C-alpha cells in the first residue's frame, strides 16, 4: 500500500469508528454511515492508541507533543513555511535561503539559553556569548547547513546616511575562558558590514561549527557575537543590533527579535523542501461514467483529531482519495497499466480473477510546521500526502 494512502487510512479509521468524522469523510461516505442498519462498534483504547502511534511514527515522533501555551513560534519559521507552501504574505525571495532549503527536507529552530555572558564592551565593540542546546538534533540526519539569525532595527539617524555602519562578527568558541585566561579562544565563522537604515534579519553561516558539534562529536561551547561600532557610540548600536534583551522588554516583543539558530537537514526520506505549485490537468475531462475511477475531494482537518495544539500550520489539507470502477474495456482516461488492461480482460471471461483496482497513481508532498516533543519548532516536508492522480492498476 502506498505510504500516503496508508497514512490517511490510519487517520480516518478511528474517526469513522468513533462517529466523529464530519470533517474527514466526504458527503457520500457520511450518508452511507448514517444509513447503516446497525451502530458502529466503539474501538478499544488500545486500538486507538496504536493508530495514533503509527501516525506519529510517520511524522518521526515517539509520542504526541504537548506544548505549553507559552511557546512562541518564531516569525522566521512562519515565513519559511509560507515560502515553501506557496502562500501569500511571504517575504521577497531570499536566494541564500532558497539554496539552503533546496537540499533539506527538515528545518529546526533553536533559541539560545538566556543566561548569556557579556564578555566585553570596550574599544568600540560589544561582545556576547550565545549557547544553543543542540542535543535534540537527530543523529541520523544529514546536516546540510546552519544559520544564525540576528535582527537589526532601523535607526532614524541612519535614514539617508550610509555612515551609520556596524560590523557583526560571528565566532565559534574553541576553548572557553578560564581563570587564567580572561577571553575564550575563538574561530571566525562569518562577518557582515551592515547599515541601520532598515529593519531586517541578518543571516550568518555557522555550518562548520554546528557540523563539528553534531556530527563530529566536538564539544559545543557556543558562539561569540561581536558588534563593532563604526563612528558610533556603543550604546546606540547595542540597542539596535538585537543581541540582548532590553531591561523592560516583555516576553512577546523579545520573542519576535531574539537571535535564532536554524539548522537545515535531510533524513534521507523523500525530497527536499520546495515551493508547492498548483498542478494543471494533463488533459481535458472526457465523458465518463459517474462510477468510474477518479479522484474525489477529501479534506483532513487536524482539529478533528485534536492535533491543532501542536501542528502550527497548515490547519488541514486537501488529501483527496481514489474511488470508482475499472470496467472492461479500460478507457484511456483511466490511466491504466498494461498489466491492469490484461487483468481486466481476463476478468471479463473468468470472474475468479479480480478486476483492476482504482488507486493513486501520482502523489505529492506537503510542508508542515509543528512543535515536537521538546517544544522545538520544526518545518518538515512529508512525502505522498496528496493524491494528484488516480488510475486502474
Curated annotation (Swiss-Prot):
- One example of a Gene Ontology biological process annotation: cellular response to mechanical stimulus
Q: Where is the composition biased (Basic residues)?
A: 271-290
Location in or out of the cell: Secreted
Tissue distribution of the protein: Expressed in femur, calvaria, trachea, lung and ovary.
User: Record's InterPro entries?
Assistant: BMP2_TGF_beta-like, Cystine-knot_cytokine, TGF-b_C, TGF-b_propeptide, TGF-beta-rel, TGFb_CS
User: SMART domains from the entry?
Assistant: TGFB (SM00204)
Q: Which SUPFAM superfamilies match?
A: Cystine-knot cytokines
Gene Ontology CC terms, in alphabetical order: BMP receptor complex; cell surface; enzyme activator complex; extracellular region; extracellular space; plasma membrane; protein-containing complex; vesicle
Q: Does the keyword Mitochondrion apply?
A: no
Q: What does this protein do?
A: Growth factor of the TGF-beta superfamily that plays essential roles in many developmental processes, including cardiogenesis, neurogenesis, and osteogenesis. Induces cartilage and bone formation. Initiates the canonical BMP signaling cascade by associating with type I receptor BMPR1A and type II receptor BMPR2. Once all three components are bound together in a complex at the cell surface, BMPR2 phosphorylates and activates BMPR1A. In turn, BMPR1A propagates signal by phosphorylating SMAD1/5/8 that travel to the nucleus and act as activators and repressors of transcription of target genes.
State the name under which the record lists this protein.
Answer: Bone morphogenetic protein 2
Biological source species: Rattus norvegicus (Rat)
* Gene designation per UniProt: Bmp2
